[in-house]
């Protein structure tokens, strides 16, 4: 079930499958029927279903990959005793512990929870200015922005986003459109 509009594009999903060498079936659920039927509220969500169609495990959020693999192997062995499985995947789980990094930050009007600017964050065309001080784990905008339920789009140049983040290894952005993006750390 796609979280972002670009994830609904079959060509993008196919490119990701190719890039990461995924050789198992991948379903593209643009109508969110799986999401709706399972009353899901989280990305990512993992549902393990046994050979009889019974949901045997549900996991919300990242991490716990070794447990998920162990459970998958158990379900495969229960469905087919004596099955020969390849060796278990051995990868370090680098999921940060809760509270050690800045939570996911969304600029969409319906999902924003950590806006640290002085203005109201609302849909439509709005003018923003960076506050003199930005609290940890919050973001602020500067310039003219068009805010909607998919995200925030600069309405005029220059426009900027400031994020006071805590990270262990990386910061990820989901962006679209045309133009130049500059990233400055501690600057």
Segments from the language model and where they lie:
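Thiol/disulfide oxidoreductase modules built on the thioredoxin-like
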Residues: 18-23, 28-73, 86
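Detector for Asparagine
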Residues: 12, 30, 37-40, 80, ...
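Sparse, context-dependent recognition of short Cys/His-centered cofactor- or disulfide-binding micro-motifs
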Residues: 11-12, 20, 32, 53, ...
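Non-globular targeting/processing and membrane-anchoring segments
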Residues: 66-187
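Structural microenvironment flanking redox-active thiols in thiol-disulfide oxidoreductases
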Residues: 1-19, 30-34
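Short linear sequence elements within intrinsically disordered, low-complexity coil regions
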Residues: 9-11, 25, 43, 111
């Amino acid at each position: 079930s796609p979280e972002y509009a670009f994830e609904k594009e079959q060509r993008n999903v196919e490119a990701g499958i190719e890039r990461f060498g995924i050789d198992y079936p991948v379903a593209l659920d643009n109508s969110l029927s799986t999401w709706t039927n399972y009353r899901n509220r989280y990305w990512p969500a993992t549902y393990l279903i046994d050979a009889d169609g019974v949901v045997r495990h549900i996991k919300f959020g990242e991490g716990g990959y070794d447990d998920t693999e162990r459970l998958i192997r158990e379900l495969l062995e229960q469905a087919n005793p004596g099955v020969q499985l390849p060796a278990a995947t051995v990868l370090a789980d680098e999921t940060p512990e809760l509270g050690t990094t800045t939570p996911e930050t969304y600029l969409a009007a319906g999902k924003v929870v950590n806006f640290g600017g002085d203005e109201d964050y609302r849909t439509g065309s709005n003018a923003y200015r960076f506050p003199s001080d930005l609290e940890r784990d919050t973001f602020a905008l500067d310039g003219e922005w068009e805010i909607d339920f998919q995200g925030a789009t600069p309405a005029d140049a220059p426009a900027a986003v400031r994020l006071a983040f805590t990270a262990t290894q990386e910061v990820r952005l989901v962006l679209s459109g045309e133009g130049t993006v500059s990233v400055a750390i501690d600057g």
